[in-house]
């Protein structure tokens, strides 16, 4: 079950105030619905992450929308981002394996960009990642695609699962 640390609890140096914890025992999720977007082609997600177990073969979902059709998740120690029910996929090369490190991820989407590599960007600890996983085709989102990541009334979720 996710643990949310309240504002009145003491910071021990190991707890992050206001943080969530997913323990991978199944079904844990936070969710809601998007409000009215200013632009449904643009989306930014930023969060801190600390890996707690070994390789994730099935995936550890960071963020999803449209009932699971569009996801950002950890898959086999790499970052994968799916659009349009997985028909558009990016799988970045950096291996996320260090269980003692905190990672800061920023996902930035702007499908109005004419250059496909500018439509979806990943930053890890302040560095833009441009290398994709070897042997995996890059399928960037189409230009001007309005994804489920910023659509009024669409559900979104933050969760984890073990595959």
Model regions: which residues?
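Extracellular glycan-associated modules
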Residues: 2-163
């Amino acid at each position: 079950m996710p643990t949310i640390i309240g504002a009145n609890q003491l910071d021990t140096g190991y707890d992050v105030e206001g943080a969530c914890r997913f323990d991978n025992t199944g079904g844990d999720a936070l969710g809601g619905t998007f409000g009215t977007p200013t632009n449904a082609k643009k989306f930014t997600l930023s969060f801190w992450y600390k890996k707690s177990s070994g390789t994730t073969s099935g995936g550890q979902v960071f963020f999803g929308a449209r009932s699971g059709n569009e996801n950002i998740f950890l898959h086999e120690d790499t970052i994968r981002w799916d659009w349009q029910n997985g028909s558009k996929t990016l799988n970045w090369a950096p291996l996320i394996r260090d269980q003692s490190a905190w990672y800061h991820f920023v996902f930035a989407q702007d499908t109005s960009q004419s250059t496909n590599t500018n439509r979806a960007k990943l930053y890890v600890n302040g560095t833009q990642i441009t290398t994709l996983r070897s042997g995996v085709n890059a399928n960037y989102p189409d230009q001007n695609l309005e994804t489920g990541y910023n659509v009024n009334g669409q559900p979104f979720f933050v969760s984890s699962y073990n595959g």
